[in-house]
Structure formats: C-alpha cells, structure tokens
UniProtKB/Swiss-Prot annotation:
Natural source organism: Bombyx mori
Molecular function per GO: metal ion binding; tyrosinase activity
Keyword Phosphoprotein in record: no
Lineage, top ranks: Eukaryota, Metazoa, Ecdysozoa, Arthropoda, Hexapoda
Protein name as it appears in the record: Phenoloxidase subunit 1
Top-level taxon in the UniProt lineage: Eukaryota
Length: 685
C-alpha cells in the first residue's frame, strides 16, 4: 500500500509529460488500460506501451475502474493558465478535489489520476492532487514536492530553461554545471521599486505564499478542508506580517512605506513586467504598464462579469460591519463581532472563503481585488490575454501592487482592532516574573545582526518536460543572515517554577525622515521572530535560544526540499507532518536586509503566563516548528492569545514603546548590518 502511496508522487514529476512515460528516479512507467489513452494516442497505445515499458525500471499496473464524470474539471483547456482567484476555476478545482477525496482507496486514486493527468490542465491537476494528498487520511504521510520543482517556470527567468534544455541534451547527467540565474532581471536600477526586488521575487517567499494557500484553501466541497482552527485570523495575521516585513525592507532601502491602494478609480502608478513564461500555456505572463486603471470586467470565457463599483459596495459593507461591530447574516440577524472571534469572522468574510458568514452580501473583496488587477491589461478579453501575476498565488508577491492592495486590506482589519478595549495589566503582566535584559550574541559585535547575499542551487530536473533525464541545477542569489542566539535574563521572585511563553519581535526605531516612531506606528511594524515556551525556575535564569529554532520559519532544506529526501517512511511520525511543514516563512528571510552602516532596530521580548496561553492538545509527531504563520495540521493554533499579541491592539496610554513596557518585558537597541558580498551555500562567514 505504501508503494501505491509513493506512486502518487510520480504524477508531480515532469507534470506535462504523459504518465505512460518514465517518471522519477527509478524510471517507473504507469501501465494504463487502453481506454485511458486520449484519442490522439489510442491507435498507437500498444506501440507506446512497448516503447516506454521496454527499459522501464519499474512497471506500475493501473486498475481499470469506472471513471467518475470529469466533464466539469475538463472545461478548463489543457494549455490555459489556472487561477484560484477566478471563481469559475475555483469551482472546477473544487469538483476535482471532491473526486480525488471521494476515491475509496489509494489504488483507485492512482487510477483516476492516471486518466486525469493525460487530460486535465497540469496546474489545476497539481493543485487538486496536492490538496487531496494533504487532506486524505490514507495519504497524510506523503511529502508533496515543492512547487518550484514541478513548475520552475513560475519562479525564474525563462532564459534559464533554454540553457537547461541545451545542458540536459548535451552534457551527461553527472557532469552538468549549475546555470546561474541573474539576480536583477525584471527591471533596471532606474526603477526605485527594483531595490526591493530581492524580497518580492525571492523564490522562497513566493513558495511560502503558494504553500500557505495550499494548506488553507478557501474553497472545497468538503467544508472540513477549509474550516480549520482560526483560519480567518491566520489570513489576517500572515498577510499583516508580510506587509510589516516588506515595509521594513523598503525603509532599509531608502524607500517610503508602501502606500495603500484604496482608491479603485485611481491609476496604479507602478508598472510590473514579470519576465516569466508559462510552459503549460506557452505564453509570456502579461505585464502591467505604469498608470494602468482597473476597469469593469466582462470576460465570458472566465464567466466573470463584475463592475468596479461592486468592489466599492463590498468594501463599504465591510466598513459598516466594523462600525456596527456586527455582521449581517443571510437571515437578516446580526452576529456581534466579539474580541475573541471577531477577527476570525472578518478574515473569512474578507478573503472570502466558503465559511464566510454571508458571501452574497459581503462579496469577495480580497480575491476579486486580485482578479481586477490581474486583468487590468485586458478586462474584456478582446486581446485574448490571460491574467497577470496578481492572479496566481505562486506569483502574486512579485508585483509591487500586491503590497499596496494588502496594505489597504490590513488597514481595514486594523479599524476593527482599534474598536477593541486596550490590553490592561491583567492581560500584559506576569506577576513575580521580571525580564532584566535581552541581547543578541553572534559571531561578532554584540547586538548586531549580520546579513549578506548567498548563492544556492535548486534542481529543475523534475519540471523539465520532454528533455533528457537527470538533474539540472540552477543557482540563484538570495538574502541570508549569520545565525545568532537570543540571551534573555529572567528573574522569578515567586517560590515555585512556572512556564513562560517567550514572545520575540523586532521593529525599526525611526521613520523615513529619521523621526522616532510613535508606539502606534511602531507596533504595526513589529515583526515576529520567535515564540516558544520554557520553564522559569525561582531566582535568576539565563535563557539562550538559537535563531535557527524560530517558530516563524522553516529551514532552507524544506523550502527547496527534494521529495526523494523525505525523512523516514510514509505513515511514520517522522514523515507524517512533512507536507504541512512545507508551510513557513523561509529561514533565509528571517532578518531584514539592514544597511551597510547598520540599520537601527529594537528587539523586544515578553514573557507571558503559559497557563493563560496554552492550548491543551497532544503535539506528538506534529509539525509545529513554523506554527506562527501556518498553524499546526489537524490541531488548534498553539497559542490562545490573539495573533500578534501584545501588539495587535492600540495602547492609547503609551506614546512610545518604553511607555508600554511592563516588568515582564525588555527591549534592546540593535543594528542590522548588511555586507555586499556573496557566499556559496554551505560556506561559513
């Protein structure tokens, strides 16, 4: 049975090549029944079977089953783009997920996959199979290969693929040199936004966004797939943290904080030319010229007819709900927005997911915002153009307007947070616990974080359809930091040991013009670095915590992991949560870039009472190392407090951060120093 489970992963290998061709390290071939072959191959099915089966490393017989009705998923042409933001595509994907989830065992799933893989749009097939593997009880131990392995065309310069085809055809597998991806290939230095392209176009960051939306889909026939613990709040918090991080990166590069996209009638000043090609659609991703305005959509092919005024109506209804602190339900009654669950209700309304309390009334503001922007170059399909990068969760974060749109959405959520009662001492204090200091120790100067460029390699071999087999490595440049430790001095004046929840954040200290931030501005720029629980015994305690253990990030190896390197066998605890573990902020982007002279920031630590924060649950074998932005699979979010606590609410009594401090908190001024040099991955220093 575990063999059949592993066979499912072969469908991710060279996704546009038919599954009767050799797949994976073992050159496995699916032996499919004659009636499964598409019409174009049916007359030669025997010859095909003999041709690819003769030197196969392993033959996989496929059970001939009565196939479900696939008419709906097959409405999306094989060689089109696929977007979860487009309601029609969402409906087709929801039906296919339903079919995959409904197969009675793994053998039947393998059978229907072999039929679908030859006919269904590869992007949609990959997405639906990934969601099914993540959520079926009998496939939970499987590690889905990273999306950049299957579809590298969504993440890098198309020139790389021409070189890769040349290398794989000419050079034998073991002797291939990595192909270098240029770092700045989408714009010149004349474009100020290009200064933060290293963040927007980072492969790991875009993979994080894609994987988060894979783990938290907003549509499926089975509500349990969508209705996960606090998913609406997590939607708010994960994107809020992205905006905080992006704003800090901008200030490190002498740019102002991102301006909200809040006037839907105004032109979008920023243009974006993605320089990406879609291998499935055989088209270049369309650009958006500077000064483009979103216009009413009328695209019958996508079943979209929507006016810009609809966005404005949905927004106004949303603001009205916050003003009234209650949401209108379909039956006309009001659901109060309380301080415990209000943000979760609003998050699901905003996104909007199928668990939105009233989708017909509050609409689909977040998703349709993406759709309007992504079709701004061809709103009525007269030029037969497909959507731009804002229409795909794997590419949206490359575009500067993504951050402008989400800065506005974040602002709307903050309006709700402003209506909540500020935290009092009862919520902030931890009696008998005093944090006397926090500091950073690393390889060099104390309280200094060091950043630089690093070159790493990713294997494109699995995504190179119709080319000779073997690894094809691409080398790309990304930001990296030297690892460091937090050193926290805590004094427990009580008579017994207690468990504390340590919350570590970092924020800039001065704004674009060099003026110190007010507390209200600074709290919105607080970046969560780590959160962990630890015992505090009576007297003085020195607690050291390694940066590599952050609850926010996943290690480099998991962002770019090779599916063949999965720990342990499927079904064991070591592998059981590996797929969920693919969700997390990339560790190489934990620390902002800083500046060559040293960018001033403030490190903040708070110790709260674990007894107030804890969620009673068994976490054995659970992947909880990146729980801050991703939660834990099949479990509750592992912290009862609001996400972003203690900075999620305003504190009118505090004008500066030092006014806000309690005895169980401490701060330390530190600097982030960037050195403009590049090291190879694996080198130290």
């Amino acid at each position: 049975m575990s063999d059949a489970k592993n066979n499912l992963l072969l469908f991710f290998d060279r996704p546009s090549e038919p599954c009767f061709m050799q797949k994976g390290e073992e050159n496995a071939v699916f032996e499919i029944p004659d009636n499964y072959y598409p019409e174009k191959y049916q007359r030669v099915s025997n010859a095909i079977g003999n041709r690819f089966g003769s030197d196969a490393g392993r033959m996989i017989p496929i059970r001939n089953i009565a196939l479900p009705n696939l008419d709906l998923p097959m409405e999306l042409p094989y060689n089109e783009q696929f977007s979860l933001f487009v309601p029609k595509h969402r409906k087709l994907a929801g039906r296919l997920i339903d079919i995959f989830m409904g197969m009675r065992d793994v053998e039947d799933l393998q059978s229907v996959c072999s039929y679908c893989q030859l006919r269904i749009n590869p992007y949609m097939f990959n997405y639906c199979l990934s969601v099914a593997i993540l959520h079926r009880p009998d496939t939970k131990g499987l590690s889905i290969p990273t999306f950049a392995e299957s579809f590298p065309d969504k993440f890098m310069d198309p020139k790389v693929f021409r070189q890769a085809r040349e290398v794989s055809s000419v050079v034998p597998s073991g002797a291939r040199m990595p192909i270098v991806i240029p770092s700045n290939y989408t714009a010149s230095d004349t474009e100020p936004e290009q200064r933060v392209a290293y963040f927007r176009e980072d492969i790991g960051i875009n993979l994080h966004h894609w994987h988060w939306h894979l783990v938290y889909p907003f549509d499926a026939a089975d509500r349990a797939i969508v209705n996960k613990d606090r998913r609406g709040e997590l939607f708010y918090y994960m994107h809020q943290q992205i905006i905080a991080r992006y704003n800090v990166e901008r200030m490190c590069n002498n740019l102002s904080r991102v301006r909200r996209y809040n006037n839907f009638r105004a032109a979008i000043e920023e243009g974006y030319f993605p320089k990406l090609d879609s291998t499935v659609a055989s088209r270049a991703w369309p650009p958006r010229f500077a000064g483009t305005t979103i216009r009413d959509l009328d695209r019958p092919v996508d079943q979209i007819r929507s006016d810009v005024s609809e966005l404005e109506t949905w927004r106004d209804r949303f603001l009205q709900a916050i003003e009234n602190m209650s949401v209108m339900l379909p039956n006309g009654r009001q659901l109060p927005l309380d301080e415990e669950t209000g943000i979760d209700v609003l998050g699901n309304l905003m996104e909007s997911s199928i668990i939105s309390r009233n989708r017909p009334y509050y609409g689909d503001l977040h998703n349709m915002g993406h759709v309007f922007i992504s079709y701004s170059h061809d709103p009525d399909h007269r030029h037969l153009e497909q959507f731009g990068v804002m229409g795909d969760s794997a590419t949206a974060m490359r575009d500067p307007v993504f951050y402008r749109w989400h800065a506005y959405i974040d602002d709307i959520f903050h309006l709700y947070k402003y209506k909540l009662t500020p935290y009092g001492n009862d919520r902030l204090d931890f009696p008998n616990i005093r944090v006397s200091s926090v500091s950073i120790e690393g390889g060099g100067t104390p309280n200094t974080l060091n950043t630089l460029w690093e070159q790493s390699t990713v294997d494109l071999g699995r995504g190179m359809d119709f080319t000779p087999r073997g690894s094809v490595l691409a080398r790309f440049t990304h930001l990296q930091h030297d690892e460091y430790n937090y050193v926290i001095e805590v004094n427990n004046t009580g008579g017994s040991s207690v468990m504390g929840m340590f919350r570590i954040f970092i924020a800039p200290t001065v704004d674009e013009s060099g003026k110190p931030f007010s507390f209200d501005e600074q709290r919105k720029l607080m970046i969560e670095l780590d959160k962990f629980s630890q015992g505090v015994k009576p007297g003085n305690n020195t607690i050291r915590r390694k940066s590599i253990d952050s609850s926010v990030t996943i290690p480099y190896e998991r962002t770019f992991r090779n599916q063949a390197d999965r720990p342990a066998d499927p079904g064991t605890a070591g592998a059981a949560e590996f797929d969920f573990c693919g969700c997390g902020w990339p560790h190489h982007m934990l620390v902002p870039k800083g500046t060559t002279q040293g960018y001033p920031m403030v490190l903040f630590v708070m110790v709260s009472n674990w007894n107030d924060d804890r969620v009673e649950q068994d976490l054995v074998g659970s992947c909880n190392d990146a729980a801050s932005y991703c939660g834990i699979r099949d479990r509750k979010y592992p912290d009862r407090r609001a996400m972003g606590f203690p900075f999620d609410r305003p504190a009118p009594a505090a004008t500066t951060l030092s006014d806000f401090l309690r005895p169980n908190m401490a701060v330390r001024d530190c600097i982030v120093r960037f050195t403009d040099r590049t090291r190879q991955r694996g080198q130290q220093g």
